[in-house]
Structure formats: C-alpha cells, structure tokens
Amino acid sequence: MTIFSKIIAGEIPSYKIAENEKFFAFLDIFPLREGHVLVVPKTETDKFFDLPDEFLSEMLLFAKPIAKAIERSFNCNRCGVEVVGLEVPHAHMHLIPINSANDLNFTKDKLKMTPEQMKKVQETIVGNL
C-alpha cells in the first residue's frame, strides 16, 4: 500500500481539497509553491500512463475546477500541471500555481509551511471551488 493509498484511506492525515468515487486531491506537504495540490486516483497504479484510458480523461475533468480554484486563490499567471511520478509509486499529477517555468522546478528547495499555514491554504482553495 502506497503512502497515497494510506492518505486516501484516512490512515494518514491530509489537507483534503476534493474527492469523488475515483479521485482524491490534497495539498502536497512538501510544496514547490503555496497552493501545490496532488490529484491521485484511488486505484493504486504505479505509472500514470498505465491508468485506464477513461481515468486519464476523468482525472483531468476532476482536476479542472481545482486548478481554476488555485488560480482564483493565489497570485499566479496560471495553474501548471506536472506528471513526474518518481518519488511515490502511485500515479498522480501536481497542480501548482505558476508565473514561470522555474516555478515547476522540482530540484528547488520545498517550502516549509506550518500546519496553520497549510490549513489556511486548504480553506482558501476549497472556498474558491
């Protein structure tokens, strides 16, 4: 069972943004930028393009209102989408408020945010859904 499956099951706490029968979205606890959200299928699949075809389109449709809420919540030009999949063997996409390509640089130091800051970000995004 991956760490994402444990988060989905409620075994590990998270800052949930949205959920439906197939997908779960929550704040990345090691964000590149404030408002960095992970969108994860509830079906545990290692590689993104090993997901069933219908999941790929449904995942984007699930992510779209979250991306729009991120854009409304933070000072950014757009919500960037990144699929990397090297750290956790569970397909997922990153939704990140960006102003330039450098904002998607995963080699940069991650933000250190307090639980209070994370909760405020969660409430802001959810409030803009």
What kind of feature is each model-predicted range?
Residues 1-129:
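HIT superfamily nucleotide-processing domains
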